[in-house]
Regions:
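Aromatic- and acid-rich polysaccharide-binding/catalytic face
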Residues: 36-44, 239-248, 291-318, 369-371
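The substrate-binding groove and active-site-proximal loops of carbohydrate-active enzymes
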Residues: 5-14, 67-86, 130-145, 251-261, ...
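Aromatic-lined carbohydrate-binding/catalytic grooves of carbohydrate-active enzymes
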Residues: 31, 35-83
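Short, acidic/polar
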Residues: 13-28, 141-154, 288-301, 317-322, ...
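Polysaccharide-binding and catalytic clefts of secreted carbohydrate-active enzymes
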Residues: 129-275, 279-299
């Protein structure tokens, strides 16, 4: 498989610069792939290279291609209201092909505040019965149907090589909250419990799995109240979960039902992509009990690509996931995201060490974040250094 240098991009930045001009620039800078988002979550960005829209502000997120409402079920896509931005995907498909650039879709999964607000029963709900409207729950059949329809709609319209699902599983505690105020320390186990969803869809899934879901919710709520009343010592989350599920069959069953719900999301998208020629990739899987419920071993026969954890911050897990993916019976493309910002000196030893770790993982694609948010000269410099690292 050819190693590719990619860049993550927003359609509004391509549209404002001119899609053809932007892709010409990327080609000349040595990039041969692009990860273009067809939908996005709530975001506020500042783009130094965008002469028309230095600030993009979206409180709840939107869909950024001309989605066809008749293809969807209960949840209808909330389409962005600027025709030029909606036209970016079609232009990107045309000009990417002529420039030898691979077009990939960067698809947001559960972090969809607009869906949670418009369809409150899809929102995450904690053990105390409080909803978070930042994210939707993967146990919702409507959410599963919507995400599959969205990806199929996109890939039926455009020649997308790979669709990467970002966070299609359960959200961690406080993920996506707006200017959150949390003034107490959460140890890993308390944070894990606080992030468990007990919406009606999750309770139904657990009951179907043979679990007394209400009893689990009540026990989690009691334990949370107790742990929140005083400071807790830090713990090894992986070891704690393993010990608890070994001694608590009901909790094990509940966590298993979470994993089944997350897996159903991936299965639904996989089915929807049949016949399109588009490969399916995902992010935030885990080799063990994970907060997202995406157990990698259960997904190897359903995916064609995997975004690995950060090889610096989570080096051991990145190595485990790479090894597991390579043991699969099908070829799985390994991808790494490389953040670029003024906090990183591309010419410094820290950045060089990061590139060395990426090279040793022997990944197939490195995506630099982000086309619009970096200075052009910084993006070009990072791209050149990545190219050198991949060639070693």
């Amino acid at each position: 498989m050819r190693r590719r240098l990619s860049v993550w991009a927003y359609p509004w930045d391509l549209a404002d610069e001119g899609v053809a001009a932007a892709l010409d620039w990327l080609r000349d800078a040595g990039f041969d792939a692009i990860e273009l988002c067809p939908n996005y979550h709530a975001i506020s960005t500042f783009a130094p290279r965008n002469l028309q829209r230095s600030i993009h502000y979206s409180e709840q997120g939107a869909v950024y291609f001309p989605a066809r409402a008749e293809r969807y079920g209960r949840i209808k896509p909330r389409v962005f209201d600027e025709p030029a931005v909606l036209g970016a995907y079609a232009q990107a498909a045309e000009h990417a092909a002529s420039n030898g650039i691979e077009l990939n879709a960067w698809v947001i999964g559960m972090f969809q505040p607009w869906i949670a607000r418009a369809y409150p029963d899809t929102a995450v709900e904690n053990a105390f019965g409080a909803r978070s409207f930042a994210t939707t729950c993967p146990a919702s059949p409507d959410v599963q149907e919507y995400l599959a329809a969205l990806v199929a709609d996109l890939c039926d319209q455009y020649p997308v090589n790979s669709a990467l699902l970002e966070r299609p599983g359960h959200a961690e505690f406080a993920y996506g909250w707006v200017r959150e105020r949390i003034l107490i320390d959460f140890d890993p186990w308390t944070r894990f419990l606080a992030g468990l969803c007990f919406c009606e869809n999750c309770l139904t899934a657990a009951r179907t799995h043979g679990v007394d879901a209400v009893e689990v919710r009540e026990r989690v709520a009691r334990e949370l109240r107790d742990r929140l009343s005083r400071r807790q010592e830090s713990d090894d989350l992986e070891a704690t979960i393993a010990a608890r599920v070994d001694s608590d069959e009901e909790l094990r069953g509940y966590l298993e039902s979470r994993e089944q719900s997350a897996t159903r999301v991936v299965e639904g998208v996989q089915r929807a992509l049949r016949g399109t020629g588009t490969r399916l990739s995902l992010t935030h899987a885990a080799t063990g009990w994970g907060a997202t419920g995406l157990r990698l071993a259960d997904l190897l026969e359903r995916i064609d690509g995997l975004l690995l954890p950060d090889p610096t911050d989570e080096s051991d897990e990145a190595k485990r996931q790479a090894a597991l993916a390579r043991s699969a019976r099908r070829e799985i493309e390994l991808v790494v995201m490389l953040w670029g910002s003024d906090e990183f000196d591309p010419g410094g030893p820290g950045f060089a060490a990061r590139l060395d770790r990426i090279a040793r993982l022997r990944v197939d694609r490195v995506g630099v974040y982000n086309f619009g948010l970096l200075r052009p000269e910084t993006l070009r410099q990072i791209g050149g250094l990545v190219r050198e690292a991949l060639a070693k």
